[in-house]
Design a protein with these regions (language model features):
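Membrane-interface helix termini and inter-helical loops of multi-pass transporters
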Residues: 54-63, 142-157, 199-208, 232-233, ...
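Alpha-helical transmembrane segments and their cytosolic membrane-interface
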Residues: 116-164
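Transmembrane alpha-helix boundary signature
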Residues: 29-30, 50-64, 79-92, 257, ...
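Cytoplasmic-side transmembrane-helix entry/capping segments in multi-pass membrane proteins
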Residues: 33-45, 65-69, 90-101, 123-128, ...
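Structural signature of multi-pass alpha-helical membrane transport proteins
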Residues: 1-36, 40-56, 77, 160-230, ...
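Juxtamembrane and boundary regions of transmembrane helices in multi-pass small-molecule transporters
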Residues: 80-91, 133-151, 168, 174, ...
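Alpha-helical membrane segments and immediately flanking helix-loop junctions
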Residues: 88-128, 267-299
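Membrane-embedded alpha-helical segments of transport systems
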Residues: 104-107, 123-142, 251, 279-280, ...
Length: 320
């Protein structure tokens, strides 16, 4: 609340995340986001799913080169980040690979566990990466939009639509967990909402109070990821991940620029779509800016699918 009152872009999300980082550095407990976190991310997923149109799926069919660019970006970003973390920062090889890949936090932690790496280090690295990316996005908004999100007005929400929205989120959360979807709290409601959009032409959306709830939920969920981290771990993690992101910026911008040309979508959309981490966070920023959040999520999901399918095969240290 203080961050929003002070005029900080993304204040409702960055504020809780910063408090969590501070509490962890001071060795204080951080409460879990609990059901609120799932519901907040579910509201975002349902809203994005309601914006999905056939063109977002056809783009993957009509532009097969998009798959090559995305795959190339994933491997190149992972390889460059892996070199930085293992050669410069002294990370263990397996952990460095999964910490460097631009995939979902939960998925990367699970892959690290399966590979016998240090899952805790990977979790902290991805949490810090998302925090730094959000801070960078807030600075960019403050610079380009003078701290305002006025470029996109959220529509009012009728009572019937609100009831349907909450029903979709509930069903999506249950179904997503049951069938073990990646990032189930986002993807479950997103798929149910997208189905309603395609079949019944019923496009669900959120209003400003619900977006604030989503920001709070995502921010506190990120804050909870810092639980158990010491000040030295956070300090060293910040400079290591900052250095890695600086190494990835040229690849990030190049991939976004190439896909912008292939798809004729704006550069802002592609920068959010190819941001090296933070699917829910980047989708929320896209929603607030009116920058095609459905397409942003589509490309993030494509990236996660590629990583889950090929991460172990692409691991550059397997023959070492």
């Amino acid at each position: 609340m203080l961050a929003d009152w002070a005029g900080v872009p993304l204040g409702w999300m960055l504020g809780p995340a910063f408090v969590g980082l501070l509490l962890a550095a001071l060795n204080n407990p951080i409460g879990s986001d609990g059901p609120l976190g799932n519901w907040g991310r579910g509201l975002l997923g349902a809203s994005v799913g309601g914006m999905l149109q056939s063109e977002h799926l056809l783009i993957l069919i009509n532009a097969p080169e998009l798959l090559l660019v995305t795959g190339g970006y994933v491997f190149a970003a992972g390889f460059v980040g892996w070199l930085w973390l293992t050669r410069v920062c002294g990370w263990q090889s397996q952990s460095g690979w999964y910490a460097a890949l631009p995939g979902g936090l939960s998925e990367m932690v699970e892959l690290t566990r399966q590979a016998g790496g240090r899952a805790y280090e990977v979790a902290l690295a991805h949490a810090l990466r998302i925090f730094l990316l959000l801070s960078l996005a807030a600075l960019a908004v403050a610079f380009v939009h003078e701290g305002s999100w006025s470029g996109f007005a959220l529509p009012p929400l009728a009572l019937s639509d609100a009831l349907m929205l909450f029903a979709v989120v509930w069903v999506g959360l249950v179904l997503g967990k049951r069938i073990r979807l990646p990032a189930h709290s986002v993807m479950g409601p997103l798929l149910i909402s997208a189905l309603l959009s395609f079949v019944l032409d019923w496009h669900l959306s959120v209003n400003e109070p619900l977006v604030i709830v989503a920001q709070l939920a995502i921010g506190w969920s990120l804050a909870h990821r810092f639980q158990g981290s010491s000040f030295p771990q956070i300090r060293s993690g910040l400079w290591q991940i900052t250095g890695m992101l600086l190494c990835l910026i040229p690849l990030w911008v190049l991939a976004a620029w190439v896909v912008m040309i292939l798809t004729e979508h704006g550069l802002a959309v592609m920068l959010l779509a190819f941001a090296p981490g933070g699917q829910a966070e980047m989708a929320l920023i896209a929603l607030l800016l009116g920058a095609s959040p459905a397409l942003v999520v589509t490309l993030h999901v494509l990236r996660v699918v590629l990583i889950l399918s090929f991460a172990s095969r692409w691991y550059p240290g397997k023959n070492r």
